[in-house]
Amino acid sequence: MFKNFKLNKLLFFAPLITLMFCFNAPQNDEEKMQTIMISVKNTLSYLHYSPKPINDAYSADVYDKYMEMIDPGKRFFLQSEVDEFSKHRTKLDDYLNRGDLTFYKLTVDKLYDRTAEIEKYSQEILSKPINFEENDELILEPKLKKYPQNQEELKNEWKKFIKYNILQEIETLNAKEETQREKKDSVNRLKLKDTIKLEILTPAQKQVKATEEVKDLMTSMFKRFQKRKKMDWFSVYMNAYTEVFDPHTNYFSPQDKEDFDVNFVGKVIGIGATIQESKGKIKIGTLVVGAPAWKSKQISEGDEILKVQSKKGEEPINVTGMLVDEAVRFIRGEKGTEVVLTLKKKDGTIKEVKMIREEVAIEDTFARSIIINGANGKKYGFINLPSFNADFEDAKGRNASDDIKAELIKLKAQNVEGIILDLRNNGGGSLTEVVDIMGLFMNNGPVVQVKDGNGRVQVMRNKQNDPIWTGPLVIMQNELSASASEILAG
């Protein structure tokens, strides 16, 4: 639950507390970062439910957390570099107070330089035959590892890591082959028509295929890194500060906040198509029925997006090689505005498709139900609720309580004997929604108490006197059910 922030009347979502900041247009990235650091410090110090001292002890914890986040596998930095970084171990509190980027720039600049070196190492390693007969030891658990002492140890670490990934790919090929054999055996045993074609590879062929797969994997990994902006790493740095202060407090960049809002509200202004990246190409995934891309009848799954004209009159942007998130931001826009995609179809033809952006619902956000026919001949209603979603900006927008109510009415009309409410993997959402949902199952009464940082207690009550369902009810949870899910389950 939101138990660590004073400003939490609306949102009740355990893992995420949003720190948002606005910037004047003239500021460059470095000035933005400095402003953010000071704003984060002030937010933590003055608005947090239970603020802690920002001192040397806090600084040391932030340092440890950040090092785990920036190089989790201890495969990028040398021990000598970490020794240099550690000189700043008790200074991070001071840097936060005054918006000093010294430590951040030191670590991120070194990370970029080192990644370029490792890319060359990887290409060199993969260009030569790899000996799989020699005995090697690769430690995967970071807590049991030490940083490489020198470049030779670093190179050897990556050689073993690459070899490990090739062996994993070979094991995957073996597993697929075994699955094919089992299916073919079943078909023959049942005397069915055999349409299964076995692809049997020799050990040498598997090694070649696995090596090529890992080459593609490494190439893709380094390309993704090159496309990441330093502001992305700054978000990592800021989250080290916030998560040490409290594990349920997070910093969101404007882009992260936009993505969070889209997933929480369950709607987006766009064309209604999932966008995917494959080997540097941006492609169309599934289409939402009724959305602009589907209605155009000119867009198909697998089409490659070459360019996006985000605004009328502007030059189209070449999106080939972009990160998916970056390409998506050109496709999204304001409702009622035009977007033009230049597509390469599967047959090689190039086509321009003009569409007007619309509001598109993300159905995976909302409650859904099915009827389960029991072995005893009775029917049971099963409702899955992914999150306690709500649209705080649109009073007519969809919310979890209205969706659950509609599903209950539908299931009740089917004369189900009981309801199973699935809250597995539901991390929470709107506190108001959980109170309203409680009213669908019970008469009015207190549901939850909220205590702010000044000790004031607010009792939130269910005011409904006409529950929709009073029959048998089972609520399913798992370790990822949190916050509002825990309140509803009682």
What are the functions of these language-model segments?
Residues I54-A60, M67-P142, F222-E277, E338-V340, ...:
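Extended, small/polar residue-biased N-terminal targeting/export presequences
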Residues F5-K9, T18-E31:
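Bacterial Sec-dependent signal peptides at the C-terminal "C-region" and cleavage site
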Residues T35, S39, A57, D61, ...:
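Extracytoplasmic/secreted proteins, especially bacterial periplasmic and envelope-associated proteins
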Residues M37-Y49, M67, K87-K91, D216-S220, ...:
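Acidic/histidine-rich, surface-exposed loop or edge segments in extracytoplasmic proteins
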Residues N28-D71:
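N-terminal mature-domain "stem" immediately C-terminal to a signal peptide or N-terminal signal-anchor/transmembrane
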Residues K52, E68-M69, T90, Y104, ...:
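PDZ/PDZ-like domain segments forming the peptide/carboxylate-binding groove
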Residues F23-N28, S45-N55, K223-K230, D246-V268, ...:
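Cleft-lining beta-strand/loop regions that shape enzyme active-site pockets
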